[in-house]
Amino acid sequence: MEGIFECEFVKVGCGRDEIANMTGQKTYDVAVVGAGVFGAWTAWHLAKGGQRVALVEAYAPGHSRASSGGETRIIRMGYGADELYTRWSQRSLVQWRDFLGAVKQPLFLQTGVLWMAGKDHARLEATVATLKRCGVEFVEHDRASLEKRYPQIALEEIQKGIFEPQSGVLLARRAVAAVVEDAVRRGVEYRSAQATNPREAGRVEHIVTSQGERIAAGQFVFACGAWLGKIFPDVLGARIFPSRQEVFFFGIPPGETRFAPPGLPTWLFQEDLVYGMPDIEGRGLKIAFDEHGERVDPDTQSRIVSPEMTKAVRAYVARRFPALGDAPIVETRVCQYENTSSGDFLIDRHPEMENVWFAGGGSGHGFKHGPAVAEYLAGQLLEGRKPEPRFSLETKETTQKRTVY
């Protein structure tokens, strides 16, 4: 058995309604496979629009092996000169806040997001220009301002910063679960299931789960994260790059408040490709390197942090946050990014299966965009809207040339 989701595709000559009448099985408008942030929001959005939706997940929404798992994710507007993702972040933040307010779950924390850069601050300047064009609120900091506002950070080569006060942190695992729960309230039928890999081209009429259930639908969306390349090896095996990413939490000294909000926001050091979050819910200072780790199999990779990365992260924390130089590591996680060659999302139709769609390639920055991905995909599925070329399968190469950060 390969991958978390394995789906057997069946191509037949009869139409959906004829099959349903003959077999008595229910036919959905859309079946979504994968209940991570892309799949959950897609199912929710389609159901809100009146579609009959099945949502299939082998483990649980936001499970520990998923790219959408874990406790926290950043939602930020800054993307250098890339206006597309800045505007998608804006739209998604509005929808996250509206949704979480409606379901009365405080799973967005407005910590603010602080970007910092040294001598090479061209990307920071490009971010400022884009935020201005998009009407995003931000505050610029020079070196003196950063030193005064954040004395707990050893700035060293850092010269400039920008602060996004409206941005912050989503409590990821719980947020995905909340979206799925509300989707079910809206009529989505949830299945915990596996199946076999696709075998036939053409129009897919139904998938067969490992429990023997046939799920018939007019269209199928595969939002399976790091498993997309295993489910569709011929098409995506060389174009989806699951990478090992190690995350660390450092304990905060007793009575210390400088490392929790509002004393410390969510933060990113541009040249170092390091990001982190303040002490949230007593978990400690979160830190991770944003460089892509080694390529891994999401089913078999070790979930234990390496001695080499542990040493590197300890050294970095001691340098940037001297007060935490002797702080204990209180928690670790090994997850994965699900990268495309450029870092752009993959939202496109299967080249040989006319009613099968891919939704993936989150590339380490996708979680925040769940609502916007769902809106875009619904427009493709239901209205045939003009596609964004950057999301096409055609643009996904077999070697990594990252351009989106």
Task: Specify the residue positions occupied by each region the protein language model found.
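Core beta-strand elements of the Rossmann-like FAD/NAD(P) dinucleotide-binding domain
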Residues: 26-28, 210-219
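N-terminal Rossmann-fold NAD(P) dinucleotide-binding loop
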Residues: 39-40
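Dinucleotide-binding Rossmann-like beta1-alpha1 core, especially the glycine-rich loop
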Residues: 72-149, 273
